[in-house]
Amino acid sequence: MEMKYIVVEFESRDANGKHEVPILFANIIAHKGMYDSVSLAYRRYDHNCFVGNVLSAGFVSIDDKGKVTCWGESESLGGVKSRPARDALLISHLQNNWSSTNVNMHHLRDHAPLGT
């Protein structure tokens, strides 16, 4: 399964410090479009959270054994590059948290819309 991703810096008034949050999405959506949508949604609906800069962007694949590989850069964000090792670690952590809540990447992959 190959998808696009961005890692965005979030800061919450309720939580301590800043957090790097990976967001995975379908290849049909531009990196900038996803960032703009997330940023707008938080400005409108969550006044306790500030969406900061995009720290990295690119493409991600997750193989059948759960290995995460990140690469590339975003043209729509002006060449923001992926951070392969760090981003793979963040996404692996996200994947492990999903697995602990009975939602896993293999299930999502098997039910992904055509063309993603």
Located regions from the model:
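Intrinsic low-complexity, intrinsically disordered or marginally ordered coil/linker segments
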Residues: M1-A88, S92-T116
